[in-house]
Amino acid sequence: MPVDPATEDHCDRSRRTLLRTLTGGGALATLTASALSGTSAAALARPTADTSDSHRFAADAFRPSGRVREYWIQAESFEHNAVPNGRDGMTGRPFTPDQTTFWAVGFRAYTAGWSCPLKADLGPQGIGSNSGIPGPVLRAEVGDVIRVHFRNMDEHYKWPHSMHPHGVRYDRSNDGAWLADDPHQPGTAVPYGASYTYTWFCSPSSVGTWPYHDHSQPQSITAPSADGTRKPGPGGGPVMEIGAELGLFGVLAITDQHTPQVDREFILFLHDASPADVPSLAHPLDMFNGGAFVDNTPTFRAKTGDRVRWRIAALGNDFHVFHVHGHRWHSPAGWVDSQLLGPSTTLTVEYVEDNPGHWIYHCHVTEHMMGGMVGRYLVTE
């Protein structure tokens, strides 16, 4: 969604924070948090656990820093073309806009009171493009409270939406996940035009890269039929997390005092959309950050000597293999140049850039690469 430059300048907000290398969205932590029964910091600092595990829970107890990170986030619908240049840059295959355009829904960050959208900030401490797909990067440090003021302004579908986080601590009223047997749980189905405030807590095991996404009531997109009526698309009934399929997702980046600064940070979401769920599409699309195929997906840039970090997340039904040509990084298994991601998992990659050239990054599942998951990575000296 284009934003007027004057509005962007007026709404600019700087953000500074530290970053940390972590693979798998906090997977180095051995703790699995128990269910939380209260909303206060004191309650969250006293999780219930078996006494044999009490030392692990104590190590992960939420200890408030006194900082509250406030975000004003809005869900918005907009017409989105995933292949705006009309071609597959690897094979030369052409596309027309009617084959690759759909009504998307995305999260955008605003100034207080949803007054105006924040300016894009692609720096290593920034919120990202703030264009809707993906949503803004929500940054915090261990000990911080994240307070998200969410408003649903999905004017096209007018569906209820929510925000569900991974990796942070919260109680049921701040979960954002809708259940049919508990349909009136606050924050799980925020109606069109309404708002809700979520409160999340960053404990030591929250350090890393995590997704957040819509987890509201299942819906289906209707399509025109031969008799002039509208019926559900080829997939039939309501689709779970269809808001996330349409673009309602983003990254949480949680750091601590050990997190090193970087020169470049790249945010990358691997996701897909199917004609079975989105009838306006001519065929399935495999996307990076809402775009499919080279020059529609992000082109990332770095210089030799830069400390580079990739924060990568995947949503949908598929497993992916992230690969960057000409580069390696260290994982718990050793040095690698490809790593597997499943649905709702994350990967944080960090290295010092030492290999100039015009490279590509892509999903190494051939079907996904041919479906659009490929982009450029340009390194200069």
Set out the residue ranges of the language-model regions:
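N-terminal secretory signal peptides
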Residues: 1-14, 30
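Low-complexity, Pro/Ser/Thr- and charge-rich linker/hinge segments at domain boundaries
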Residues: 256-267, 381
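N-terminal export leaders
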Residues: 14-31
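C-terminal segment of N-terminal export signals and the immediately downstream linker at the start
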Residues: 8-12, 33-72
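Mature N-terminal segment immediately following signal peptide/propeptide cleavage
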Residues: 66-84
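Histidine- and aromatic-enriched segments that form or immediately flank copper-ligand environments
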Residues: 80-253, 317-343, 362-365, 369-377
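Acidic-aromatic/histidine active-site loop/patch
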Residues: 264-302
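Intrinsic-disorder/low-complexity, polar/charged segments enriched in Ser/Thr/Lys/Arg/Asp/Glu/Gln
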Residues: 66-70, 133-135, 143-147, 195-199, ...
